[in-house]
Amino acid sequence: IRYDRPYRKCARIVGDTMGKYHPHGDSSIYDALVVMAQDFKKGRTLVDGHGNFGSIEGDGAAAMRYTEARLEKLTQDVFLSDLDKNVVDFVPNFDETEKEPSVLPVRIPNILVNGADGIAVGMATSIPPHNLGEVIDAVKAYMKDNTISVKGLMRYIKGPDFPTGGIVVNKDDLHKIYETGSGKIRLRGKVEVEKLKGGRKQLVITEIPYTMLGANIGKFLNDVASLIETKKTTDIVDISNQSSKEGIRIVLELKKDTDVENLTNMLYKKTRLEDTFGVNMLAVADGRPETLSLKQIIEYHVDFVFEITTRKYHTLLDKELEKQEVQEGLIKACDVIDLIIEILRGSKNREQVRKCLVEGITEGIKFKSKASEKAAAKLLFTERQANAILDMRLYKL
């Protein structure tokens, strides 16, 4: 399911995942896949979905037998690169028939970029998403100066960046939230005023609080309709939801001479056009759940990237040293090529040759002379060098 290969049926992906790694039912796997493909829920989608993957109004995705998916390029490059270079440990899967990475060698703090939410026994986490560029800039700033404060990091990360947009009302509280890892963010929808013919106006909502996602959009429309029916406002003539794949567009057509500011404030007060997002930056750190500050999350991430980068280059170095060892052995073999061919001709099997090349044991090998046998006993190639010589075709030798 690489990004540069054709889409694959989601039913196949879910089946493979359940059979190899997650024997706990297909619905939870498919739900997770769908969320990772929804750009209105994730700041950066990790799955490239093809087909009906639901809508911002809360419509569900089509059944997995109809939809297709593959990885986004970002996922391939940032989450899965260098897995073949021993950057993380591999552990057996649930039935010990496969190996799987204990963690993915992700090169960005995805917990900040895409946020996280979930519940467990006695604990819950709720981390808002942030702008990828801002997060990377903050990580770079920490790497230059690891004594930087949360306030210093906030010069780069201005605040949450929700995929649905919205305006943070209590910006002054963000420092405390990022310092302690918990708090509440007050969000407002973005309202624009458009002028119509005849001096009339309409309010257009182009961004909504993240908490208004899904069925809550319909609830907002019902709440506005209820305000009209109960005559708590007489300024709204019509309401329509014109949202599409291009984005949110909820239109409130107004009477002439409506006090737009008063009406907007009433909508903030009486509906979910203003709402709170609870923050609890709980994560598993060193095997234990811990509420982390913004700086701690970045610190853990940088330490992790340092670890996987160190492991990567240790692996590459080991491979180059092995290659060097083999090349040195082949160079040495070139100098005694006639003797090696004599050993090959005089031996009965591969093991005899190996013992002669590595340990200097000449027993059972027929030599042309005692001098040759004496020289063969002093070759002393390494095990790796001997195998390289034995694996090489004679014409190459």
Question: Which role does the model predict for each range below?
Answer:
Residues 29, 67, 131, 212-216, ...:
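Short amphipathic alpha-helical segments
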